[in-house]
C-alpha cells in the first residue's frame, strides 16, 4: 500500500482477502500520510464487501515495528492475519446454546443474550508466498493445468490494489 514498490507485495494480501470473501467489493477507502518522503509512508485501506464484511489493511515503511497486517470483520467473526509474523487469529461469536469450547469466553450482549466467543490460532505454514505462487504458475504452464490463482482472480486483486493506490495519491 505504501509507495508503488509495495503495491506488488500488497496485491498478494488483497488476493488472500478476495479469496476468503467471494462477495463483490462494494466500496474502497484509503488514506495515507507522507512523513519522510513525497509518497505515503503510512497507509490504511478499508475494503467493504456487499455482504457486509470489511477488511482493513495497514502498511508502514517508517513504523518502529515492521507490520503487514490485515483484519477482516464480519457479522459473527473477526479474523486477524499478520503476514510478517505468520500469525493468524480467528475470533467467532456464537449463541451460548451452540457449544462451549476450551478457548472460549461467555459474554452478554446489549440485549442481555449470552454469547460464546471462541478464540482460534490456526497454525500457519511458514513459506515464501510469492515463491510458492510463482512455482504454482510455472507448474501450471509446464503441466498445462490451471494455477491456484486464476487470471480473473489476479486481475481483480490488481484492480483493487490500483484503486487503493489511486485513492492514496488523490
Region roles according to the model:
Residues 50, 132-170:
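C-terminal helix-rich "cap/oligomerization" subdomain common to oxidoreductases
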Residues 31-33, 50, 59-62, 75, ...:
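Histidine- and/or cysteine-centered catalytic micro-motif in compact active-site loops
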Residues 9-34, 46-53:
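Oxidoreductase and adenylate-handling cofactor-binding alpha/beta cores
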Residues 1-8:
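Short, small-residue-biased leader/transition segments that mark boundaries at the very start
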Amino acid at each position: 500500500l505504501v509507495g508503488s514498490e509495495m503495491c506488488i507485495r500488497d496485491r498478494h494480501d488483497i488476493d488472500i482477502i478476495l479469496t476468503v470473501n467471494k462477495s463483490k467489493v462494494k466500496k474502497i477507502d484509503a488514506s495515507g500520510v507522507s512523513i519522510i518522503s513525497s509518497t505515503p509512508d503510512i497507509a490504511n485501506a478499508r475494503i467493504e464487501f456487499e455482504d457486509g464484511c470489511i477488511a482493513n489493511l495497514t502498511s508502514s515503511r517508517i513504523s518502529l515495528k515492521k507490520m503487514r497486517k490485515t483484519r477482516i470483520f464480519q457479522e459473527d467473526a473477526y479474523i486477524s492475519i499478520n503476514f510478517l509474523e505468520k500469525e493468524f487469529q480467528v475470533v467467532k461469536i456464537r449463541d451460548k446454546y451452540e457449544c462451549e469450547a476450551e478457548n472460549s469466553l461467555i459474554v452478554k450482549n446489549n440485549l442481555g443474550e449470552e454469547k460464546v466467543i471462541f478464540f482460534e490460532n490456526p497454525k500457519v505454514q511458514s513459506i515464501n508466498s510469492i515463491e510458492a505462487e510463482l512455482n504454482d504458475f510455472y507448474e501450471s504452464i509446464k503441466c498445462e493445468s490451471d494455477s491456484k490463482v486464476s487470471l480473473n482472480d489476479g486481475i481483480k486483486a490488481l484492480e483493487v490494489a490500483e484503486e487503493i493506490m489511486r485513492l492514496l495519491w488523490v
